[in-house]
């Protein structure tokens, strides 16, 4: 038996769905940019945090939605799979400079229609010197410009787009739902003392959080309604039932807590998706997926509500949906980030906070699902340690033999002591996950780009040093 046969094949529809997504031509998508521009224009008097919340609300209310006919999960980033939205609040400079070059680039080719070009030309003037890149460059010393122009170091990705590199607290989202966050925020807001000047900023922040929660809830409800409409027209009995179930689930999560494996998967996907609709950050990672999803998986298995095969198909669908997320970078940025990578990392294995092996039944299912899909997304990372389940580790080796570069291995024996030496609490150190390419972080507790980032061209530094000796 070869390695491919060892892990089994995708179901027929997931194989077809996979091929559809892989074959999809990536287009530049202007819809988000147009909606974001309208939101910024309408709310110029608002504090920035409120502008961002209202922008997300407008996008989630106005963007096109659809449900793929082979998908078990609802939620799309753009008007079509693999389309790349534009985020004008970061910059429009490279977008306008490359408007007629996207289809001619050496790497990361994107297609663009004349209609899209016209839409982008119409909104571009509003963003001139009114974006993240412009403000960032205004803060930099003149010497930095020289070093950037001569290639000593670069920050193209940081100036042109979000960078994320974090894993959110999915365990809490699943157990509390956004409804739990809403309750907490309302309590904090009600307790504000407005004789304290800091309460002004806190109140604005709380208001923004409540706006976002409402927007996310309504976004999921849009899919609930769409799934019901599709179900009413569906003639295939099995698909009709799936759409009705999808409608029911989307009416509930992520606002309400998840109570089943299917609800948990849909809830996680909505949050994973919306964060990238809002911020354009890559390396938005799933965290310790087999740990926070395990209770929902085992509950459904024990109650006979789902089989391992059902869960396997659902996870392969999730990974295919993960591949639909796309991001356009400037041509110069593609020189170091070719292939439109999104670095959405999934971590399995490792240890529990009481130092026991964390491998469970779902760890094997996740591993098998990634082996079956064999995609560039998500990045799969296995946390290795001295007492890891031997059979599980052997299975990891078998996946590596498939030759698509996964899973990566993180060594708990090195990483956990290092975190503790840096002052990270032991329970957090044992709960770390991979984010992005190879970085590590504590899910839900470490924020944006906590690992730092800089591209330094050391040979260029040496060359300049020799010139000036």
Give the ranges of each region predicted by the language model.
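Conserved catalytic cores of very large enzyme subunits
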Residues: 2-206, 242-245, 249-467
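Extended non-globular scaffold/tether segments
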Residues: 207-218
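Helix-boundary capping/turn motifs
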Residues: 216-220, 288-289
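Heptad-repeat amphipathic alpha-helical coiled-coil interaction surface used
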Residues: 217, 224, 228-231, 240, ...
């Amino acid at each position: 038996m070869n390695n491919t046969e060892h892990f089994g094949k995708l179901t027929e529809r997931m194989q077809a769905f996979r091929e559809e997504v892989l074959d999809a031509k990536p287009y530049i998508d202007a819809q988000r940019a147009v909606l974001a521009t309208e939101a910024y224009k309408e709310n110029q008097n608002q504090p920035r945090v409120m502008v961002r919340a209202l922008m997300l609300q407008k996008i989630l209310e106005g963007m096109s939605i659809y449900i793929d006919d082979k998908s078990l999960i609802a939620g799309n980033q753009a008007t079509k799979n693999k389309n790349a939205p534009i985020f004008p609040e970061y910059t429009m400079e490279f977008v306008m400079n490359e408007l007629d070059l996207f289809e001619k680039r050496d790497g990361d080719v994107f297609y663009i229609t004349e209609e899209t070009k016209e839409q982008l030309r119409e909104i571009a003037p509003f963003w001139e010197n009114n974006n993240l890149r412009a403000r960032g460059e205004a803060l930099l010393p003149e010497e930095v410009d020289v070093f950037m122009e001569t290639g000593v170091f670069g920050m193209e990705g940081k100036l042109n787009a979000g960078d994320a590199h974090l894993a959110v607290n999915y365990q809490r989202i699943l157990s509390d739902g956004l409804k739990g966050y809403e309750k907490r925020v309302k309590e904090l807001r009600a307790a504000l003392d407005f004789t304290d000047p800091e309460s002004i900023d806190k109140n604005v922040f709380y208001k923004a959080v409540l706006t976002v929660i409402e927007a996310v809830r309504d976004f999921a409800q849009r899919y609930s309604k769409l799934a019901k409409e599709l179900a009413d027209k569906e003639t295939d009995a099995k698909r009709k039932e799936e759409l009705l179930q999808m409608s029911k689930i989307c009416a509930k999560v992520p606002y309400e807590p998840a109570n089943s494996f299917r609800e948990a998967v849909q809830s996680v996907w909505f949050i994973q998706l919306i964060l990238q609709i809002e911020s354009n950050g890559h390396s938005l990672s799933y965290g310790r997926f087999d740990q926070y999803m395990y209770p929902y998986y085992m509950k459904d298995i024990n109650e006979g509500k789902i089989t391992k095969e059902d869960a396997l198909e659902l996870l392969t669908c999730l990974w295919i949906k993960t591949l639909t997320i796309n991001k356009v970078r400037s041509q110069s940025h593609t020189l170091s980030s070719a292939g439109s990578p999104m670095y959405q990392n999934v971590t399995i294995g490792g240890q529990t906070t009481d130092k026991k092996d964390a491998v469970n039944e779902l760890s094997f299912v996740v591993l098998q699902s990634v082996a079956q899909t064999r995609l560039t997304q998500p990045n799969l990372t296995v946390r290795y340690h001295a007492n890891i389940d031997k059979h599980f580790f052997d299975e990891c080796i078998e996946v590596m033999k498939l030759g698509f570069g996964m899973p990566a291995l993180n060594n708990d024996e090195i990483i956990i002591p290092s975190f503790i030496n840096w002052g990270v609490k032991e329970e957090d150190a044992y709960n770390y996950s991979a984010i992005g390419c190879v970085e590590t972080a504590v899910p839900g507790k470490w924020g944006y780009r906590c690992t730092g980032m800089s591209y330094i061209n050391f040979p260029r530094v040496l060359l300049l040093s020799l010139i000036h000796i």
